[in-house]
């Protein structure tokens, strides 16, 4: 085989390998301390990235639509549409809600529609009752679609929470944005597309910006279950089996440890006896935990920060709980003394 032919074959093999790697990537939360690029043009006019809007595929329930009826690309023609992929236990997604709600309140009368596509990260987020509660708790009034089997997610080839896809009144994709921030740019893009669709005057610009100070966040998002568990100091138990653990007195930086009787499951770890202990060394200004109750009853957790009592948390519904706050950031050891069996720990996020 000639040298050029061998080189071509090698390049083809590399491309195939890269394609396989990317096809195996699962859904991802956008890293809290990085901001993916927003698609823009130097002329200020948004490019056409795709000529049509994908269908809302495999949606099992709609909220905030007339009669709970589904929306379609055809029914949205003539509107500027922002499709926002989110999930209710994701802190990054929750931090975007004040912006999205203010954007919708200001520009819906001018022709903006926001569609929140709720694609679950955890099993409990596929439950319509849990999603309904989250919509009400967060005061969301724009349409929301439940995408439990990732039909719409896959139709968009999406990979991230949160992820925004902005369509013009003709149904063409004009901009994408992944992660938090750049809210003023998104608002300007919405105004630009509304201006293309109509000459009617728009309200003055200005929306809520809740972008956090990422420089205070050192500890990465951490998962606890067998599927994606990381940073654990201790013996990992087999699925569906109780394991006795001894907690390290002081965890390593950005690591967690546990003491007492615990059970490891694919998406979470669960306390199995009263008096179990959880410790985590974190550097951030807030620690949030995605927690649930195995039987749905209230579970009580006492919180200690650097050895000092810092309140308590009552866990019932599976959702994000703010467990500890550290003004000014810095490194701290958070200890949770758990009164009840059946507290499920899914993940930790920071702000």
Task: Label the model's feature ranges.
Residues 55-81, 104-107:
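A short beta-strand-turn-helix
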Residues 2-39, 43-62, 184-351:
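Non-globular targeting/processing and membrane-anchoring segments
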Residues 136-141, 146-189, 325-327:
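Thiol/disulfide oxidoreductase modules built on the thioredoxin-like
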Residues 76-79, 109, 140-141, 158:
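Active-site acidic short loop of glycosyltransferases
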Residues 94-137, 146-153:
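Structural microenvironment flanking redox-active thiols in thiol-disulfide oxidoreductases
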Residues 69-94, 100, 113-115:
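Short active-site neighborhood of thiol/selenol oxidoreductases, capturing the structured segment around
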């Amino acid at each position: 085989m000639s040298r050029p032919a061998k080189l071509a074959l090698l390049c083809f093999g590399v491309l195939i390998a890269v394609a396989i790697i990317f096809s195996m990537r699962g859904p991802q939360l956008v890293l809290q301390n990085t901001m993916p690029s927003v698609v823009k043009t130097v002329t200020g006019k948004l490019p056409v990235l795709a000529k049509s809007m994908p269908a809302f595929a495999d949606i099992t329930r709609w909220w905030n639509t007339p009669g709970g009826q589904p929306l379609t690309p055809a029914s949205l023609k003539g509107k500027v549409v922002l499709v926002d992929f989110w999930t209710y236990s994701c802190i990054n997604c929750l931090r975007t809600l004040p912006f999205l709600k203010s954007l919708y309140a200001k520009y819906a009368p001018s022709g903006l529609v926001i569609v929140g596509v709720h694609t679950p990260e955890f099993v409990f987020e596929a439950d319509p009752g849990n999603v309904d509660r989250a919509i009400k708790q967060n005061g969301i009034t724009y349409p929301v679609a439940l995408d439990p089997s990732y039909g719409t997610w896959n139709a968009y080839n999406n990979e991230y929470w949160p992820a925004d896809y902005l369509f013009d009144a003709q149904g063409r994709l004009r901009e994408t944005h992944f992660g938090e921030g750049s809210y003023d740019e998104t608002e300007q893009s919405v105004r630009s597309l509304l201006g293309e669709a109509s000459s009617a005057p728009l309200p003055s610009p200005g929306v809520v910006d809740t972008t956090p100070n990422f420089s205070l966040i050192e500890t990465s998002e951490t998962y606890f279950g067998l599927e994606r568990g990381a940073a654990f100091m201790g013996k990992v138990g087999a699925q569906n089996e109780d394991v006795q653990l001894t907690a390290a007195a002081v965890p390593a930086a950005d690591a967690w440890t546990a003491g007492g009787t615990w059970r490891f499951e694919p998406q979470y770890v669960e306390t199995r006896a009263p008096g179990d202990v959880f410790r985590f060394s974190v550097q951030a200004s807030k620690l949030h935990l995605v927690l649930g109750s195995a039987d749905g009853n209230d579970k009580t957790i006492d919180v200690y920060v650097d050895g000092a009592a810092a309140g308590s948390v009552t866990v019932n519904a599976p959702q994000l709980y703010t467990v500890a706050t550290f003004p000014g950031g810095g490194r701290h050891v958070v200890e949770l003394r758990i009164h009840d069996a059946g507290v499920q720990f899914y993940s930790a996020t920071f702000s």
